[in-house]
Each structure stands twice: as structure tokens, then as C-alpha cells.
A protein has these predicted regions:
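Intrinsic disorder/low-complexity segments
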Residues: 1-50
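Soluble, non-membrane globular domain cores that form compact, hydrophobic packing
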Residues: 53-331
Length: 331
């Protein structure tokens, strides 16, 4: 009965047909329960309409970010819009990586000057942190002052600002039209507000020895395996509720990869630590720190610190790896 009342109350103000049905049945003494499917169907239909119009509004907001022209380049053709359902039509084989960062929408707009074409892609993510994460996967190039972070190289500008990742590409793959590309980037960046905030977990990566542009942020195993393949199994229990950062380090004669994973609670972190040690390092536990040779001349390490799990790979110095992990716990 409570479900029926809930459904009827929420729909009646919007559905005069529903009101007439209820009142007619009340007068005739008929059982009112058959109206429940009708009322709930109408409620679902209204909800779908709301979602549809929200999508239209978001798409129009994305389109408004694009200037009409930049230097000698002007908009050409209609902008193409993609969402979570049809992203595969544009990114055949690569859509999973974007969906792993809670991708929402993509608008693609071409600009032309004569026979030359520049393509602008604006990816909208659910959060600023995920937009940064997607940007962090490819930071190759020289730093430029656009958006919250940006790099440029070989006719490709990539920048992150707010909840957006923007890619601007000269399809000829050279630097002939760098001024137009940078001008487009600056105009689009100015239309995006507010600025974004990088993931807080990023600040836990030690600055000393960190290779510039090597830091990555992600949540899921599919991203980790693209950065550093561990296993086809999800040994570290990565999912949408976990956050992870990864970076490359040069520490004197030692280089290594550092991975930090933050879990929702200590029990989940402990389970992941134990599973990693047993299944990957293939060693028994004797505390919260383990270092094990995994291949000829290379060591992997793991350090459990409450909800955080620190992992190192590719080190060739067992003792230095232990000291490195020990210092991490003090952060």
C-alpha cells in the first residue's frame, strides 16, 4: 500500500489522466490497484524525458565552448556528439579507457582553412579529478600555459581544465599551424569555468626523484594494466571506489615505478595487500612490508599503511627499495 501511495502522490500533479482514472474508479467502486502500472509508467516516462533534456542541455553547453574561428580557421560541418552509449563509434578499441574515468560526453568540431583541417575534441567527465586522470595518461610534449595543465607537441595540444579534457589536433601532424591551435585552446579554456582541482592523492607522491610528466591517476585495473601489466586477474581489487597514483622515479643509480592505492577502508586494503603478496610476490607475510625478487635482478615491494597500499616495481636494489618504502610510510 505504501508503494502505491508513493507512486500516486508523485505522479498526480503532473498527470491529469491519472487523476481522472483514480477518481472514476473511486466513484464506481472499482479496485484502484490496476492504475499502479499506468501511474508508474508515466513516472518513468517523465524521468526519461528529464534525462533526455538534461543531455540536450549538456550537449549545448559543450558546443558553446567552441569559438566560431581562430586565426584563418573557421568551423566546418556540424559538431558531432557522443555519449557513453555510442563512444565506441568514435573511439573503436579505446573507449574502455575513457569510460573507466566516468566519461559523460564528447563533442568533436572540425575547423578548416583551405584544405587544412584542425580537429577539436572536448571530453566531459563527471569530476575534475577524473578529467585530470584522463589527461595524465598522455602528457608527452612541452608545457604550455593553457587551462589547468597543458602540453603541446607535433601538432597536438592537450589540456585539462575543470571537468574537461581537450585535444586539438592538426591532422597534418606538424607545427605549421601552432598559432591557430594555441589560439583555439586559449579561447576554449576561457569558456570553461571554474578551474579544476587535481586529486589529493597526487600530493602523496614524493617529489624527489619523480620523473616529470610521469604521474598518473586512475581507479580501475584496465588503466593499471595499460600502464604496467600485472595480471589478467584483479589482484589489487581495483574498482570505482579505489583511487590510485603512479609515477616513475630516478633515485641515484636506482630507478623504479611507485604505485599508491587508497582503499575505502583498512580491511579492504589489508585484503588487497595479502592477495598481492600471495598471488604476485608468491611469498608469506611477516609484517606490513614485503620485498621479493620477481625476475632476474629485479625486486617488487609492498607496504601496507592503514587504508593505503604502496607498491614498487622494477627496482634492482633490494636494500634501497626497503629504505624507500620505509620513508614513504612517514609521509
Amino acid at each position: 500500500m505504501s508503494n502505491f501511495l508513493e507512486c500516486k502522490t508523485s505522479v498526480l500533479p503532473l498527470n491529469r489522466v491519472g487523476v481522472e482514472l483514480v477518481s472514476t474508479q473511486s466513484r464506481t467502486g472499482l479496485n484502484s490497484s490496476p492504475t499502479l502500472p499506468i501511474l508508474c509508467f508515466n513516472l518513468v516516462a517523465i524521468s526519461l524525458l528529464v534525462l533526455f533534456f538534461q543531455g540536450v542541455i549538456m550537449a549545448n553547453q559543450l558546443k558553446s565552448l567552441f569559438p566560431q574561428k581562430a586565426k584563418d580557421f573557421e568551423k566546418s560541418d556540424q559538431a558531432k556528439i557522443f555519449d557513453r552509449k555510442n563512444l565506441y563509434d568514435y573511439l573503436d578499441g579505446g573507449a574502455e579507457l575513457y569510460l573507466a574515468y566516468d566519461f559523460q560526453r564528447l563533442v568533436v568540431q572540425d575547423y578548416k582553412s583551405g584544405e587544412t583541417s584542425i580537429t577539436v575534441e572536448v571530453y566531459s567527465m563527471e569530476t575534475s579529478q577524473d578529467a585530470f586522470g584522463l589527461y595524465s595518461l598522455d602528457q608527452e610534449g612541452e608545457d604550455v600555459q593553457i587551462g589547468d595543465r597543458a602540453t603541446y607537441g607535433s601538432g597536438l595540444l592537450k589540456f585539462w581544465k575543470g571537468n574537461y579534457l581537450v585535444r586539438i589536433t592538426d591532422m597534418s601532424g606538424n607545427d605549421r599551424f601552432i598559432e591557430a591551435i594555441l589560439d583555439l585552446g586559449k579561447n576554449i579554456s576561457q569558456n570553461i569555468a571554474p578551474k579544476g582541482k587535481p586529486p589529493e592523492l597526487l600530493a602523496k607522491l614524493p617529489a624527489d626523484g619523480l620523473v616529470p610528466h610521469s604521474e598518473r591517476f586512475f581507479h580501475k585495473q584496465i588503466i593499471l594494466n595499460n600502464l604496467y601489466f600485472l595480471s589478467t586477474e584483479n589482484l589489487l581489487n581495483l574498482n570505482e571506489k579505489t583511487s590510485a597514483v603512479m609515477g616513475d622515479y630516478l633515485l641515484g643509480k636506482m630507478n623504479l615505478k611507485l604505485l599508491l592505492i587508497s582503499y575505502p577502508d583498512t580491511s579492504i586494503a589489508k585484503y588487497a595487500f595479502e592477495n598481492f603478496c600471495n598471488r604476485y610476490l608468491k611469498t608469506s607475510l611477516s609484517g606490513n612490508r614485503v620485498i621479493q625478487k620477481v625476475e632476474e635482478g629485479k625486486f617488487a615491494g609492498a607496504e601496507l599503511d592503514k587504508k593505503n597500499l604502496w607498491l614498487t616495481f622494477e627496482s634492482r636494489d633490494e636494500k634501497a627499495t626497503g629504505n624507500f618504502l620505509r620513508n614513504l610510510k612517514k609521509r
